[in-house]
Amino acid sequence: EGKALVADAHIPNGPYKPAGLENYAYNPNKARRLLREANWDSSIELDMVYYYGDQLTVDLMTAIQAYLADVGVKMNFRRLEGDVGAQLWTGASDPSGPAVVKWDLAYGAHGPLALQEYYSRYETGGISIAPSPADKKLDQMIGVITGTPDVQKQKEGFFNIAKYMQDQLYTYPLYYQQAFIYESDRVNRNGGMYGNPQYNYDWGITNWTTTPDANGKMIMRTNTGPIEFFEHPWFNPGLFIANKVLFDRLITCDGGLAPTRPKMAKHYSLSADGMTLTFIMKENLKWHDGSPLTADDVKWSIETALKVPNLMPNFKTTFSSLKGAENFMNGSASGISGISINGNVLKLNFAKVDPNVLLSFSQFAPLPKKHLKNTDPVKLQQDPYWQKPIGSGPYRVKEVQMNDYLVMVPYDDYHEGRARIDEIIASPSNDNDANLIKNASAKRMDYGFTKNVADVKSLENMNHMNVLPQNIPYTRLIWFQKFRKK
């Protein structure tokens, strides 16, 4: 419908993508021949999972099921619910398996923070979609694109890995999409910028206003509120409204995700060789319970994040590049030696260059050590803290009823000033809200974003809604689970 492009690689069209990639057009005769040559057992039934709640996704699953049946492959599909991240991405402890996840095929999307993240998640020992057995050639290619700040070397590396991944077909890219921000005519950003809505940028939320109601209160209604728990911010740092406004970051970036200025830090500096990053944190930072937010919270958060199973690959690359990270991870050290604290000065010394280190810290939200220090990092998402989290951002939780509503109000002691909108009310949903059009039609939706084309067309027909397309790196794919089953 004019709002998507056919994909022939993970990476979107642009200077980092080579020409002439195989696009694997549908060819049932060739598929049948290859299945015969592979002695495919037609009694096997593949389990395909997805996590979107819209009818278009169900229709797509039904179509894929029919295409597979036509060539002699059985497939059933089901929607994941609950801790979707763990069900999708928990990796096997051994590169030879067995698998921890229960699915064979998964449909979803990847909208990475940095282009390297399209591929770094396939590194041996990583999440569930890493090749099994291990692919050392791929690991070396990942090392090239994640290990140099040299743009030309990165470009050559992306050309090589894009072609190799498409030749090996470890994952099947389907199409590229824009994101569409929607806002009601009640919302005024008052000069705040627009950008990639899946991540955090300097959007000036504290200065937004809405048309006051009959009581003079400014309320903004949105979605992506919690269903069973608040999603932790270390895998999808800006996908959910709570992760955008309940938590804060050391630095911020522009709408294109280029780091621009300090946030919780009052100053930061990266050495010319990229090996030392220094933050001077603001004085009197506070968590929403009034307790101090310190450099020790940041250090603890970095160390804890490295042990969380579903950690954003960009964060993992940055933190594992620190001096002493390897010893910390293998248990031979109690902390990461490359992190040092002197009062409100946090210094990070790296063993190797990470070209996206500032980008990582524009998205990484420290969590309160006080409330989570006794939690097993492997089970971070299951901690009771995520029923009503205490954050550091411009809004705090006032009231929440899981799978019903979330009310957030300004945090009076926020270090960049009290936010002007009196309440943000979020209805429960994942990033694809099945109730979006119903709520928008009833004028109960003021802000959000979507990639659902049918929803975009409906919103564009509502006089009180504005739709603003944003170009983002975002690819819909089918992932293949390659580990042996138990």
Predicted regions and their residues:
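Detector for C-terminal structural segments
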Residues: 1-19, 52-66, 90-226, 238-244, ...
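Alpha-helical secondary-structure segments
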Residues: 1-8, 34, 44-55, 148-169, ...
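Ligand-site clamp/hinge motif
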Residues: 74, 383-386, 411-458, 473
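A bilobed periplasmic-binding-protein/Venus flytrap-type ligand-binding module shared by bacterial periplasmic
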Residues: 126, 133, 177-178, 206, ...
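A structural "hinge/loop" feature
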Residues: 182-200, 223-241, 264, 291, ...
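N-terminal lobe/hinge region of extracytoplasmic solute-binding protein
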Residues: 221-272, 390-391
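Aromatic- and charge-enriched surface segment that lines or borders ligand/interaction sites
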Residues: 267-314, 347, 442
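Surface-exposed binding/hinge segments that line
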Residues: 299, 315-374
